[in-house]
Amino acid sequence: MTRKRFLCPSVCRSRAARTGESKRRRLHSHDRRRCAITPDFDEDGRMAHIANPRPNPLECAEASQKVIMAPSRSDTTGAHRCLEDAAPVGELLVPRSSADLHESQRGQPSGATDSQASTLETESAPPSADSSSSAKLQRDDEFLAKYRVIGTLPAGSFGKILVCALRASVGEAEASRVPRSERRVAKRVRATSRLAIYLENEILALQYMNHENILKVEEVLRSEAYTYMITRKYDYDLYSFMYDGDLQWKDRPLLWQTRAIMKQLLCAVEYMHDKLLMHRDIKLENVFLNGDGTIVLGDLGTAMTFEKPRVARDYGWVGTVTTNSPEMLAGDGYCEITDLWSCGLIMLDMLSKDLLPLNGNTKKPGKQLRRIIRSLSVCDEEFPDPPCKLFDYIDSAEYTHTPMSVPPLIRRMGLPADFEYPLVKMLTFDWHRRPGASELLALPLFSSTITEERLFVWGLKSGAAHFSSWKPACRIESDTAALSLTMSDDDE
């Protein structure tokens, strides 16, 4: 029989104190490890990478009073500001303090209308000291006076998503009767929130660019409480088109649809890189599309400037773990070529018969990186040359796979050569060997003379449910030769 050991109360209290202190130390250590790979914020709302602190040039007085974009690579006429006057390379495009930015813009004319504002049924009133000032704040909100909220969408990474329409266009019609062409999406964040930094960054990046495959900002409205970015509403994003809520296949794009989507996506990425901007968070959820086959790239809250192409720098970890490139997951320096890895994952998800083949469903970069190495059978000779942190994961390398060959995961998909080659190139493990967007667009799959008008029938009924309703204007001879297209009889 085991004898129980009794301790006096003072000993129990001392032991409990030591146990609590040990737990606090472990939690503190865990927080330090977490902050080493994720962005954190200080009391002023500035984002700081704990693992690699460095001075922020945007804290100078001149930079905090003006918002400047980086020049285009092709600009040699001096039409744009030089890099010395632009936002410092490797920093967000806006001043870090959203409160300072809002204060500098408060004196600008807002152009508010005098029409009666209504309350927001789906949202609570902004917090305030007393209810009368809160009600006045809502009545004075220009967005609520100009737009009518008819619904909400799942919240994004950096704000609340509202579905709205102009009051002057739809009046008080039922939400279900509002035409799709009149619907807009408003991304809303609190003006004093740390998330306002990312929204202001996205607004600047989108307003700086003008491309048919990049989301366009229709209007920006600011009140004392919120900042709104209004854009066109698209039918769905690529993720909601492909998968349902239970992560089951809903529609898998056909080969010719995949080609059209990827060509437009690469055109958008090429344009961004020509403007010396990298996205850093390209994924299925950030590619928006309509039933007519047009796609746009959005959600540029993490976009960042760079000075020279293919020059890796330590910009810090950002984005989504499951779609980050190997160099970013390892904590190495990276460049704009990291966006091409994300494009390759999108193409892999569209062509694969498996659900998200490289999605490890993890938030740990190291675990996701080892999953990539195993899934793509990365050989030790395919690792970048040291010194680099990525070389520390060479113990997970595949030693039986032929270096620089097609990974078995992709080979088993049985794709046509025109599809397999660009997919393998985009998913090249070593970013030094990974091609840029311009090189990929020069490949036969995307450089074909087939026009987009020949791939789609325009003028589809508004609100087409899925891409399966698209009708190619030319027929494909076989699935293994997706690019050998012939004219339909009614087109001759």
UniProtKB/Swiss-Prot annotation:
It is found in: Host cytoplasm; Host nucleus. GO terms for molecular function: ATP binding; protein serine kinase activity; protein serine/threonine kinase activity. Its EC number is 2.7.11.1. SMART domains: S_TKc (SM00220). Phosphorylated by UL13 homolog; this phosphorylation regulates subsequent phosphorylation of UL31 and UL34 homologs by US3. Autophosphorylated. Residues 106-122 have a biased composition (Polar residues). One of its GO terms (cellular component) is host cell nucleus. Its main location: host cell. It catalyses: L-seryl-[protein] + ATP = O-phospho-L-seryl-[protein] + ADP + H(+); L-threonyl-[protein] + ATP = O-phospho-L-threonyl-[protein] + ADP + H(+). Disulfide bonds: none annotated. Residues 147-446 form the Protein kinase domain. It is an enzyme of class 2 (transferase). Residues 124-135 have a biased composition (Low complexity). Residues 99-137 are annotated as: Disordered. ATP binds at residues 153-161, 187. GO terms for biological process: symbiont-mediated perturbation of host apoptosis; symbiont-mediated perturbation of host chromatin organization. Keywords: ATP-binding, Host cytoplasm, Host nucleus, Host-virus interaction, Kinase, Modulation of host cell apoptosis by virus, Modulation of host chromatin by virus, Nucleotide-binding, Serine/threonine-protein kinase, Transferase. This is Protein kinase US3 homolog. It comes from Psittacid herpesvirus 1 (isolate Amazon parrot/-/97-0001/1997).
